[in-house]
């Protein structure tokens, strides 16, 4: 039987991994690249002078970290697009990686050799070399304005090598090297495709579970819900003006200019303060308390990683024969995505059919809502680290970004004392996700955490 095949897996060794992760939160404004770079170095200088500073292994920046985000036409963004191995974003990442001997991941607007434009994130290794470039797979409405292209590859994984960051459980120090499987998701990648795909497809997080991703890195420009996104309002001058006045008043109440806060830094460096768990029903999206995270969005981000969360009802799905149909009918990407328009999927299919592991790869490793044919919760007993770098500030007087950058650990555990009839919370109350710390919604700054987790080799 197919389900029995999974039990033929080889025995694996558990490694304990320790990484120092630094997240930078910025408020970049269009036309202010140099100023944003200057503030970045100012933040990094303050980070290194902290009494609790430790050298980071990874530094993650937001989506479009230096350029600003709200471009309304192709001609508006063209002065800021660059090739993947040149330009201000690459040069900054290269300098940071060489200085700190770490990986740097930064979001930027890309112009490829065929003059196609992408919303991308580049990865620079500790030697200052660009080793991976990811292009956003699911696009937000704003990107349509400047002819952004979908990533024809779809979601991807890539290896990240870390020196002396791992050990066996019976060893005292982290003296082993480890290669982690990583994946990047840029903002809208976390949401349903075009906001029209079924909510419970959880495309990106399902991809990560299916492919045993251990390190999930998300540069973002995610909005606070007080932003003006309603198309009827945006296309009605009187409604738009009233809505913009409301935002301006909210900013004034917080003592902020129309662009939001810049140059006032919130630093959470090396402490162990975790983000308090707040149920979805109690979280507010009001734009106040700039040094506190937007828990409404934090809870939503956690929900979008549902396949990583403990959920008791999975045992019932596992017993249901319709699970097989759901898994076998699952496509790699939504069928109207660019992935299916250039023949790439046909190449992938040929490669798959040539593999001796075709049954395991196509069936046993696939999940629906986190459930596979081999086990009710495929992620059970595993660990993964999620790092979200979101920008803050305001653009156009209409768009407020949610900030709240943070670091999370999915521990793969059923909550202690949980009974079979207990309901599973699908927000920050779910104990299978650990909130290792968040920045506030409205301030630039940095958060540095040492994260410890298990991987199997």
UniProtKB/Swiss-Prot annotation:
Pfam families: CN_hydrolase. Signal peptide: none annotated. PROSITE patterns: CN_HYDROLASE (PS50263). GO terms for cellular component: mitochondrion. InterPro entries: C-N_Hydrolase, C-N_Hydrolase_sf, Nta1. It comes from the Eukaryota. Its EC number is 3.5.1.-. CDD domains: ScNTA1_like. The keyword Hydrolase applies. The active site is at residues 63, 136, 187. Coiled coil: none annotated. GO terms for biological process: protein catabolic process; protein modification process. GO terms for molecular function: protein-N-terminal asparagine amidohydrolase activity; protein-N-terminal glutamine amidohydrolase activity. Residues 19-453 form the CN hydrolase domain. Keywords: Hydrolase. It is an enzyme of class 3 (hydrolase). Present with 1640 molecules/cell in log phase SD medium. Deamidates N-terminal Asn and Gln. Component of a targeting complex in the N-end rule pathway. Belongs to the carbon-nitrogen hydrolase superfamily. This is Protein N-terminal amidase.
